[in-house]
Amino acid sequence: YEPHTVSSDRNDHLSPEFLSLNPNNKIPALIDPQGPGGKPLPLFESNAIPIYLADKSGQFLPTEPARRYQTIQWLMFQTGGTGPMFGQLGFFHKFAGKDWEDKRPRDRYAQESRRLLGVLDRHLEGKAWMMGDDYTIADIAIFPGINTLTTYYNAGDLVGYEDFGNVRRVFEAFSARPAFQRALNIPDRNG
């Protein structure tokens, strides 16, 4: 793959080229020049892309129907749960909302984020990954959000992150993966 920087400061996400990939003008977007039938396939949405890539590569998404749908279930948990809740918490904790006198919005998202971490923590009891021993696109979708919550938004204390031993354990294993370490440096921040 070839990563491309899309800068909101330069309004790259509003360019005709980017909008042809993602009419919702948000990252991520992907174009597979060798899509189905050998034709280019543009895709957008954080969890549509990994389903496509997993299907294309034959990796990270079980083929057995029940396990496949359970994996997709956890992908949707990220789409409708941890993704938006952690993002809203980040807005109210770190960005514009941090200066608002009324802390109810921040506290509401912190409470819901904590609840979702509890769901994950209970699910991960006795498991290496979201789907047991199988590393899947559910892990690839969920655990970068844990990183964003705790390091970028600095909201670990606010949600009581230390209380979720199973989440911490699996996140540590996820963080040690070479692919995650490479992803932290996209775009190249060393040169």
Task: Please provide the spans of the model-predicted regions.
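GST-like domain detector, emphasizing the conserved glutathione-binding G-site
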Residues: Y1-D107, R114
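Structured helix-beta-strand junction loops
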Residues: N24, K56, G126-K127, R177
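Exported/periplasmic ABC-transporter solute-binding proteins
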Residues: R182-P187
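Residue-level recognition of oxygen-bearing side chains
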Residues: A48, N166, A179
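GST-like fold's C-terminal all-alpha helical module
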Residues: W74, Q78-A176
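Carbohydrate-binding/catalytic loop surfaces
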Residues: F95, D188-G191
